Amino acid sequence: MSEPHLLIDAGNSRIKWALADARRSLVDTGAFGHTRDGGADPDWSHLPRPRGAWISNVAGADVAARLDALLDARWPGLPRTTIRSRPVQCGVTNGYTTPEQLGSDRWAGLIGAHAAFPGEHLLIATFGTATTLEALRADGRFTGGLIAPGWALMMRALGTHTAQLPTLTTDIASGLLAGAQAEPFQIDTPRSLSAGCLYAQAGLIERAWRDLVAAWQAPVRLVLAGGAADDVARALTVAHTRHDALILSGLALIATDTAAPATAQD
């Protein structure tokens, strides 16, 4: 039996990981928080030694150092590759003027989406600290994207930079809006703030989707991923598909596509 690939998606909010088998199926998955947020280390004691680790890290050098320490503690000398965006990989062509400027998480997500929905035009909306939108043609050409503050960041900015507005988390906002989204306008400040920022997310996505359909003169599947996808989905008025493993699935494809790392660092 071939060794699995360890896949790590280090985002700004949390770190997800998975083991992928020879068929690129995610056979074991988990997540853990950042040290700054009190996140405990993952329990990898039950995992077999992987062939190597393929990492997408958009969370900075401190997180990279923590991941190195975790990997060395569990599997000393384990080969690892920190992925970066390329001009072309796994059937996807990078349309950025400077391809390497595209975030590695977005690149892996594009590769995962192209494989998950072959032959379809896609608009991929991913909800994290930032909300990102990617336009991906059926032939694998990434033609560009948009980046906006995420739902939580929008609400936190209002709470931090105003004197009278509360600072709300997505958990609080989601609870406030439970059963209230049928009403187009809210009648207290916390719900008004929660709904206003949520509708800003939905409005951005629907506008981008309609513009893309008009520009391409073809059907476009809207794909949602990320932590706030359920809440934003309830505010949308257009058809959409949920997929929460695009980045890890893309990393599995990248791991298969690339040769085994030759050294412990890349």
From Swiss-Prot:
A monovalent cation. Ammonium or potassium. It catalyses: (R)-pantothenate + ATP = (R)-4'-phosphopantothenate + ADP + H(+). The keyword Transmembrane helix does not apply. Disulfide bonds: none annotated. This is Type III pantothenate kinase. Its main location: cytoplasm. One of its GO terms (cellular component) is cytoplasm. Pfam families: Pan_kinase. The keyword Ligase does not apply. Belongs to the type III pantothenate kinase family.
